A protein has these predicted regions:
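Conserved beta-strand segments of alpha/beta enzyme cores
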Residues: 14, 70-72, 107
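Hydrophobic/proline-rich hinge and linker segments of small-molecule sensing/allosteric domains
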Residues: 22-40, 64, 117-135
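Bilobed "Venus flytrap"/periplasmic-binding protein-like clamshell domains
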Residues: 28-89, 96, 163
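Pocket-lining segment of extracytoplasmic ligand-binding domains
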Residues: 74-165
Length: 172
């Protein structure tokens, strides 16, 4: 779950000790068809930003960076196409789109992980974390153990794990 979104579900879900996405000098990216200043995206200036969700850490970081802006909700893997077609002036990219946007001729306006690091003296940008339903009670330690073992297996068998994960990569 996104760290921003976690605030809205913390009464029902607990953050787990294992597994998180932290952007260290890298994070969600704001892209556009053409160069523009981020202040051009501020609310009331006639520009719209495609975002992957209102509760995403990417949206919160973009708001902190830009200030308030006009936006539309677009499925994260459709944002590059929506920006390329001109449906939006810019977009906040997460996941694979962060790596492939240049192939569509889009330009980087800001890497929010880099921006966050500059603003915070080098702290990583908290993006997402693994959660477990609080009502699972006595099962939570078992879920935690299994997740820890899965992560350890992936780290011990990186080539096999990456090959498997690439099967789920959209556009990679």
């Amino acid at each position: 779950v996104s760290i921003h979104g976690y605030a809205y579900v913390a009464d029902r879900y607990a953050l787990m000790n294992h597994g998180a996405s932290m952007g260290e000098g890298y994070g969600p990216r704001i892209v556009a068809r053409e160069e523009m200043h981020l202040t051009d995206l501020q609310k009331g200036k006639g520009k719209r930003l495609a975002i992957p969700g209102e509760w995403t850490s990417a949206h919160l970081a973009a708001q902190m960076c830009i200030g308030e802006y006009d936006y539309g909700l677009v499925e994260f893997d459709h944002i590059p196409d929506a920006v390329e077609r001109g449906e939006y002036d810019a977009g906040v990219l997460i996941h694979e789109g962060q790596l492939t946007f240049e192939e569509q001729g889009l330009v980087l306006l800001e890497d929010l992980g880099v921006w966050w690091g500059q603003e915070t003296g080098g702290l990583p940008l908290p993006l997402g974390g693994n959660t477990v339903r609080r009502d699972l009670g006595d099962l939570i330690p078992e879920v935690s153990r299994l997740l820890r073992e899965s992560i350890a297996f992936g780290l011990d068998n990186r080539q096999e794990a990456v090959a498997y994960a690439l099967g789920f990569g959209r556009g990679l």
